[in-house]
Amino acid sequence: MEKSKRLFLKSKRSFRRRLPPIQSGDRIDYRNMSLISRFISEQGKILSRRVNRLTLKQQRLITIAIKQARILSLLPFLNNEKQFERSESTAGATGLRTINK
């Protein structure tokens, strides 16, 4: 019985703790593009808190800074290059439909 109980005990493995994405000296500001760009996806969307590994307060400040940068035209609202490629190829195919009676 003693031996079977010992089989279920797992050895504690040490793991490397990840560095926080925002250091104590970093200032969250709409002008700090190098910091803000780390928290935006390729499409220009704000990444979630779980993906960023930020605290609630940090995520709120990052979101406000990104929105201010967008309003002041420092960041684009959308960064969807595929949309433009697709619209050029389908531009000739669209037309008015006529109803035959």
From Swiss-Prot:
Location within or outside the cell: Plastid, Chloroplast
Keyword Phosphoprotein among record annotations: no
Domain of life of the native organism: Eukaryota
Claim: tRNA-binding is one of the keywords in the record: no
A GO CC annotation given for this chain: chloroplast
Entries under PROSITE patterns matching the protein: RIBOSOMAL_S18 (PS00057)
Gene Ontology BP annotations: translation
Keywords on record: Chloroplast, Plastid, Ribonucleoprotein, Ribosomal protein, RNA-binding, rRNA-binding
Record-level Gene Ontology MF annotations: small ribosomal subunit rRNA binding; structural constituent of ribosome
SUPFAM superfamilies: Ribosomal protein S18
Alphabetical list of Pfam families matching this protein: Ribosomal_S18 (PF01084)
Family, similarity comment: Belongs to the bacterial ribosomal protein bS18 family.
Subunit record text: Part of the 30S ribosomal subunit.
PANTHER family: 30S RIBOSOMAL PROTEIN S18 (PTHR13479), SMALL RIBOSOMAL SUBUNIT PROTEIN BS18M (PTHR13479:SF40)
Listed name of the protein: Small ribosomal subunit protein bS18c
Organism for this UniProt entry: Eucalyptus globulus subsp. globulus (Tasmanian blue gum)
Lineage of source species: Eukaryota, Viridiplantae, Streptophyta, Embryophyta, Tracheophyta
